[in-house]
Amino acid sequence: MLIDKFGRPVTNLRISLTKECNLNCFYCHREGQQDGERTMTPEEIERIVRIASRLGIRNVKLTGGEPTVRPDIYEIIQRIRPYVVDLSMTTNGTTLYASAEKLKEAGLDRVNISLDTLDRKKYKMITGYDVLDQVLKGIRRATNLFYPVKLNMVVMRGINDDEIWDMIRFAGEVNAILQLIEIEVPREMENSQFFKDFFYPLKPLEEKFEKIAVEIRERKMHRRRKYFLPVDGKMVEVEVVRSMHNTTFCMNCTRLRLTADGYLKTCLLRKDDLIDILGPIRRGATDDELVKIFKRAVQLRKPYWIN
């Protein structure tokens, strides 16, 4: 197992398959990626995952952009499936109604679906597209095939902060887990107008959850809290993701990232941490040389928010 200088094990790999997306959400952080021309092939992705698995990284999440815009998404899943214990994907859900069964057959274990609002006009304002009904159909299809299904709601002040309880009820209705997520920006953007306008702190909401939850659990990843809330006769699982200035969150991060253009990246918010792995692969690097690249990336890891 790989362990960084801060004693944090690295067990998860988050792979961006593409920077392309069929939506245009105004707050998107693009997985912290910069512009790049290279695209990893299914064979190259498989090799990187195989090396990662050899080093004890056996939990993989596929992201984008929107990963399902890649026509070879099913091949990618099939290729990496043998090397991982848990294979999940974050998606905007626009293609799920048509693709969920094929994704399951290819070997995908579970999905996280971005859903910031249940209001059609708001959805179009946030994403640029009027496809909410299509996404909701995809969510219902997914909950019949995958378990668990998580709904990711980025809570934004003045936009959807009035829908939190509606979203909790919807999650209960479709038997999904709801993740409430604070907007996350690097230090240099904390004084930006964007952050001032839209950041909605979730700590007060967590304090309310603590009073009404039937059960509270804590995940190893980031020490996130999960609240089991009785709502409309159902037990709804709600997870709160608060990363801004959260040193506990950072000290319990077990994740390494792989950008769509083939760089290992240690932190979403950092810009000085890219380690090229695709270039060496294309220049004929051996497996042992790729192992050294992984180890070098892990030794670069450091908590972004730290006392």
Curated annotation (Swiss-Prot):
Residues 5-232 form the Radical SAM core domain. Catalyzes the cyclization of GTP to (8S)-3',8-cyclo-7,8-dihydroguanosine 5'-triphosphate. It comes from the Archaea. This is Probable GTP 3',8-cyclase. The gene is moaA. The lineage of its organism: Archaea, Methanobacteriati, Methanobacteriota, Thermococci, Thermococcales. It holds the Pfam family Radical_SAM. Belongs to the radical SAM superfamily. MoaA family. It catalyses: GTP + AH2 + S-adenosyl-L-methionine = (8S)-3',8-cyclo-7,8-dihydroguanosine 5'-triphosphate + 5'-deoxyadenosine + L-methionine + A + H(+). S-adenosyl-L-methionine binds at residues 27, 65, 114, 189. GO terms for biological process: Mo-molybdopterin cofactor biosynthetic process. Keywords: 4Fe-4S, GTP-binding, Iron, Iron-sulfur, Lyase, Metal-binding, Molybdenum cofactor biosynthesis, Nucleotide-binding, S-adenosyl-L-methionine. [4Fe-4S] cluster 2 binds at residues 250, 253, 267. Binds 2 [4Fe-4S] clusters. Binds 1 [4Fe-4S] cluster coordinated with 3 cysteines and an exchangeable S-adenosyl-L-methionine and 1 [4Fe-4S] cluster coordinated with 3 cysteines and the GTP-derived substrate. Signal peptide: none annotated. GTP binds at residues 14, 61, 90, 150, 255-257.
